[in-house]
Amino acid sequence: MRLILLSSLLLLGIFLANGHEEDPDGKVLNSLIDSLMHLQREFANLKDAFLTVHRARSFGSGSERLYVTNKEIKNFEALRQICEQAEGHIPSPQLENQNKAFANVLERHGKEAYLVVGDSANFTNWAAGEPNKAAGTCVKADTHGSWHSASCDDNRLVVCEFYFIL
């Protein structure tokens, strides 16, 4: 949609730069302006529809972040690539409600998944006796949302985190 808006602006700029000899009544210019205004309205409508869906999904999970699985089972490196390709992130719950939303996905699928824990995390949900570096350098969440040290080579449910800043 932004590409269309930019293209319309480019056409309008080219038209204005070349003068008005071929459009003495301004019909072409007015048509371009009308088209641009229509595209702006369509873009605003699309943005509103997107935000409505996002708010509805966020309301249901209690989290502004969305945790989505493609149901594949992969190791940590494959997860990183998949989430990056999807323009998402490896889950990194920063609040209890985010961890609950993440755990809900795991519980529905009956699988564990990887997550990353930030250095300055204010929220953690380590299981008793964790973290345990002997178990591995990665972190997995169980179906209850408890965190455990884990090997990065094990295959787990692919879950990516998406969040929107508008």
Swiss-Prot record:
Compartmental location: Secreted
Pfam families: Lectin_C
GO cellular component terms, A-Z: extracellular region
Record's signal peptide: 1-19
C-type lectin domain: residues covered: 46-161
Coiled coil: none
Expression across tissues: Expressed by the liver.
Gene3D superfamilies named among the record's database cross-references: Mannose-Binding Protein A, subunit A
InterPro entries: C-type_lectin-like, C-type_lectin-like/link_sf, C-type_lectin_CS, CTDL_fold
Role description: This phospholipase A2 inhibitor binds directly phospholipase A2 in the presence or absence of calcium.
Summary of subunit composition and partner proteins: Homotrimer; non-covalently linked.
Protein name in the entry: Phospholipase A2 inhibitor clone 04
Protein's organism: Bothrops moojeni
Organismal lineage: Eukaryota, Metazoa, Chordata, Craniata, Vertebrata
